Amino acid sequence: MNLRGATAVLLAGTGSDDDYVYRAFAGPLHDAGARVVAPAPQPRRLIEGYREALDEAARSGPLVVGGISIGAVVSVQWALDRPDRAVAVLAGLPPWTGTPDDAPAALAARHTAALLRRDGLAAATAQMRAGSPEWLAVELTRSWAEQWPDLPEAMERAAGHRAPDAAELAGLAAPLAVAAATDDPVHPVEVALEWVAAAPRAALRTFTLAELGADPAVIGQACLAALAEL
């Protein structure tokens, strides 16, 4: 698919921010000739804010849409709802299919929200840093502080947000390019495989968490490599 001149709108994951999702996708998309937009998350209205950003951008023409984790969920749902406005979907680290229930990403978001409410930002951040790789600790320390004090609400809303199920993904008109880590316990590669198996035109490329930690652009690179197969 030729992306030259296309506009790509990329949505951040829960607790993450527009800075990270931009770095994850901008380099590969710019190399392909696309314009990249990464709207800042609005933690008090995370899902609604993302959908409004997509609707606003689509007024100028069809979009490449995508994101990471809950950003991928919102993007693929928007593409299902607006089949005439979505050129392609770039889904990084999809978190679940259908209802979140006990999906690891949903459980992690609920747990973190509870810690933040109980212990406050400083203590919860210190606990996160103690149990995270350095690269992730740096990213989340910044993005959590930016979204405080509304971060717990955003996490809880995301953890309860339903993704399209397999039957709904079967109706996706746009090509779906999925990128996932083979060793991510929070975003299992099995979810990515479910999305790819369900959508009519879909492909998956993978990487490791070590590769992601070294360069977030592996997400965008993997998505564009998957898209090139379609």
Feature annotation, model-predicted:
Residues 67-75:
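Gly/Ala-rich beta-loop-alpha elbow adjacent to hydrolase catalytic centers
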Residues 138-166:
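Hydrophobic, aromatic-rich cap/lid helix
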Residues 201-230:
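Catalytic active-site module of serine/aspartate enzymes centered on a nucleophile-bearing elbow/loop
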Residues 172, 178-180:
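Short beta-strand/loop motif that positions the catalytic acidic residue
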Residues 1-45:
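Conserved HGGG/HGGXW glycine-rich cap/lid loop of the alpha/beta-hydrolase fold
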